[in-house]
């Protein structure tokens, strides 16, 4: 994955963009993947690890109503997380991740469900991926890989 992270840094630097992220189930893995690369300070603004609902509200401005209506693992919350990170960090691009890494989950929100959002000045897009009950480490790795790929695709389609 470092190849993808390196590509992200190279492209963001060329475009003069700053990136931030808001992470729940990945617990800082996206931030770590980006900052593992020398020179990342030129494009990585900061990261937010908002594991609890309270942290999502306090640090990112996620609304209590959205959390109550949709639950933490939802595209609605992922969108508010990304938009809040973008606003708080004053960055150009924000990625957010909220999911159920496991073990656990329910019939309606199964283990392996991860919601993503990507926010920038042009708007916010979100999606849900069902990775399945792969086990906690594998779901978290799949979420990291998918998040980095979303950033890469977005940057490669810009300009």
Task: Give the ranges of each region predicted by the language model.
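Short alpha-helical segments enriched in small residues
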Residues: 1-159
